[in-house]
Amino acid sequence: MELSHRQGTTTLTRTHPNDKEGQQDMNSFRANHSSLDNSKFKYHARLSQSPLGSSLGQGYLETPPLPPTPTCRTSLAMNSHPEDLKKGASRSSSRDARETFREGCVGEEGQDSRSPEQRTVPLSKKDSVIPENIRHKFGSKMVDQLISEDQARQAIGEMFEGQKRPSSWPSRTQSPMQASSIFSDYYDLGYHMRSNLFQGPPQETKSLMKASYTPEVIEKSVRDVEHWHGRKTDDLGRWHRKNAMNMNLQKALEEKYGEKSRSKAK
């Protein structure tokens, strides 16, 4: 079998033309090829009518079909009758019907996107200017009663406009006198008002440490070893206490017997 490929045509030549099976294959192949050629011709005609066909020329792009919307699916189910399927409607006619329905659905979606005012869609939380934490804290009903979305947008717009005004920005060409006059009211408040201490007017303060803890008080004080404030009662404290007593005893013994040994040596 020899195949010669051309644009839109395909020719087949068999070496055994008298074979009946070969003739049947040829007839079935021609019938299928003619139906494919008709569908391709229709698709080329649609592309030539569209603005993309003029720019692409003879070549064409196979665009994947758009997924039908729920309304289109219902319309397709309504319009498809079992009688048409029983009669054996051609595939090309069903494809044409589907394409027309898809075009209509796409047109409806485009109209919906172009005219959002006609659709009454409730305002979502994402589009709201008021943060969700405020609505959660005070309740959405209370927030809606106190402030509306328009008022919130207006307040935010005024704030941004005030920031964008050049008059509100501190100019770099201001003299130090002008700069000091701007903050004069702030510095007139005083240190206590500016630091939020509010301790009142300054007063003469006198420490009572020397008046209460005089040398007489320290001399008359009696230290109770058993009930000494800050005394450690754990094993480490006991060991240090015993060690201090041993060191003091050793020093006393050295002083006592050291003097006796020195006197004997003399």
From Swiss-Prot:
Low complexity composition bias: residue spans:
47-63
Null mutant: what phenotype?
Mutant adult male are fertile and there is no significant change on litter size compared with male wild-type adult. No differences are found in testis/body weight ratios, testicular/epididymal tissue morphology, sperm counts, sperm morphology and spermatozoa motility.
Enumerate the InterPro entries for this protein: CIMIP4
The protein's predominant localisation is cytoplasm
- Composition bias, Polar residues: 1-15, 24-38
Q: What are the top taxonomic ranks of the organism? A: Eukaryota, Metazoa, Chordata, Craniata, Vertebrata
> Positions of the region Disordered?
1-124
Q: Gene Ontology cellular component?
A: acrosomal vesicle; sperm flagellum
In its keyword annotation, does this UniProt entry include NADP? no
Keyword terms: Cell projection, Cilium, Cytoplasmic vesicle, Flagellum
Localization of this protein: Cytoplasmic vesicle, Secretory vesicle, Acrosome; Cell projection, Cilium, Flagellum
Q: Does the keyword Isomerase apply?
A: no
Any Pfam family from its record, for instance, is TEX33
| Annotated protein name in UniProt | Ciliary microtubule inner protein 4
